[in-house]
Amino acid sequence: MQKRAIYPGTFDPITNGHIDIVTRATQMFDHVILAIAASPSKKPMFTLEERVDLAQQATTHLGNVEVVGFSDLMANFARNQHATVLIRGLRAVADFEYEMQLAHMNRHLMPELESVFLMPSKEWSFISSSLVKEVARHQGDVTHFLPENVHQALMAKLA
C-alpha cells in the first residue's frame, strides 16, 4: 500500500524553503500531494490557479509530487485524497504552538491523520513567502530564495 502524504500551505508564492521540505518529504513517502489552499482571507498576491501553476513548474523534477489546489477542510481533503500523513514545516519555536493546535484539531477530525513536522534546512529556516514578498516590494534581491519561474512571476506582479 502506498504511503500518501499531504504538504499543505498557501504557497503565496512557493519558496525554496517549501521546495526543501517537499523534496525531503518525497524521500519519506511514496506520493506527496502539495496542497495549495485557496485561503481567500489571506488575500494572496497570486490567484490559486497561478500558485498551482508556479508550484507545478517548480516541482517537475520531483516524480512523486502532485500539485492540487483545494478549499476544503484539511481533514476532509486528506480523507478524499486517501492520505494519512500531514507534513508541516517548522521554522522556529514560534511556529510550534499554532502547529500543535492544528495537529490536535486534525487528529480530532480524522484520527488516522498523523502530523509530521520537518524543519527546513538551515539555509531556508528564516524565510517565509510574506518576508520574500516584502523584501521584493522594496527592490531587495530575493533571487536566492525562489525557484527561477517563481522569481520571474513575482517580479512581473510587482512591475
UniProtKB/Swiss-Prot annotation:
GO CC annotations, alphabetized: cytoplasm
Protein name: Phosphopantetheine adenylyltransferase
Record has Signal as a keyword: no
Quaternary state and interactors: Homohexamer.
HAMAP family per record: PPAT_bact (MF_00151)
Annotated localization: Cytoplasm
Keyword annotations of the record: ATP-binding, Coenzyme A biosynthesis, Cytoplasm, Magnesium, Nucleotide-binding, Nucleotidyltransferase, Transferase
Residues that, per the record, bind ATP: T10, F11, H18, G89, L90, R91, E99, W124, S125, F126, I127, S128, S129, S130
GO MF term set: ATP binding; pantetheine-phosphate adenylyltransferase activity
Pathway: Cofactor biosynthesis; coenzyme A biosynthesis; CoA from (R)-pantothenate: step 4/5
Entry's EC annotation: 2.7.7.3
Gene3D superfamilies in the record: HUPs (3.40.50.620)
Catalyzed chemical reaction(s): (R)-4'-phosphopantetheine + ATP + H(+) = 3'-dephospho-CoA + diphosphate
Role this protein plays: Reversibly transfers an adenylyl group from ATP to 4'-phosphopantetheine, yielding dephospho-CoA (dPCoA) and pyrophosphate.
Enzyme class: transferase
Positions that bind substrate: T10, K42, M74, R88
Family the entry assigns: Belongs to the bacterial CoaD family.
GO term, biological process aspect, one: coenzyme A biosynthetic process
